C-alpha cells in the first residue's frame, strides 16, 4: 500500500512539473506579441533603444519599438519614420 501511494505521489509531482510546451507539437505556440493598433504620433528617436517585428502569424504587420523606460510602442512598418528608425537601429 505504501508503495502505491509513493508511486502515485511521484506521478502526480511529475505531471505537475511537466511543461505543456513539451507535449505540444512544434509550431503550435501562438505568437508572443501582436499589435492591433499603431501609435498615432512619431516617438522621439532618442527614446528608442531597440525594436522587433511582430510575427507573420499576427493579423497585421508591425514594428515594436522598445523605449529606454522599457515601454513597447507599436508602429506601422510602412511609415517612413518607422523605416528610418529601423535602419538606424540596424546600423548601431
UniProtKB/Swiss-Prot annotation:
Similarity-based family: Belongs to the intercrine beta (chemokine CC) family.
Any one GO molecular function term: chemokine activity
One GO-annotated biological process of the protein: inflammatory response
InterPro entries: Chemokine_b/g/d, Chemokine_CC_CS, Chemokine_IL8-like_dom, Interleukin_8-like_sf
Organism the protein comes from: Bos taurus
Protein origin, superkingdom: Eukaryota
Disulfide bonds: 34-58, 35-74
Name of the protein in question: C-C motif chemokine 4
UniProt-annotated location(s): Secreted
One Pfam match: IL8
N-terminal signal peptide: 1-23
Gene Ontology CC, one term: extracellular space
Keywords of the record: Chemotaxis, Cytokine, Disulfide bond, Inflammatory response, Secreted, Signal
Complex and partners: Homodimer. Interacts with CCR5.
SUPFAM superfamilies: Interleukin 8-like chemokines (SSF54117)
Summary of the function given for this chain in its UniProt record: Monokine with inflammatory and chemokinetic properties.
